[in-house]
């Protein structure tokens, strides 16, 4: 799992 993917996932959840 790449950090960018995780960040994107978290951002999607935040949004």
UniProtKB/Swiss-Prot annotation:
Job of this protein: Catalyzes the oxidation of cytokinins, a family of N(6)-substituted adenine derivatives that are plant hormones, where the substituent is an isopentenyl group. Substrate preference is 2-(2-hydroxyethylamino)-9-methyl-N(6)-isopentenyladenine >> isopentenyladenine > cis-zeatin = isopentenyladenosine = zeatin >> zeatin riboside.
Activity profile over pH: Optimum pH is 6.5.
Cofactor or coenzyme needed: FAD
Record organism: Triticum aestivum
Residue pairs linked by disulfide bridges in the UniProt entry: none
Main localization category: membrane
Domain of life: Eukaryota
Name of the protein this chain belongs to: Cytokinin dehydrogenase
Compartment list: Membrane
């Amino acid at each position: 799992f790449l950090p960018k993917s995780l960040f994107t996932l978290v951002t999607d959840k935040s949004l």
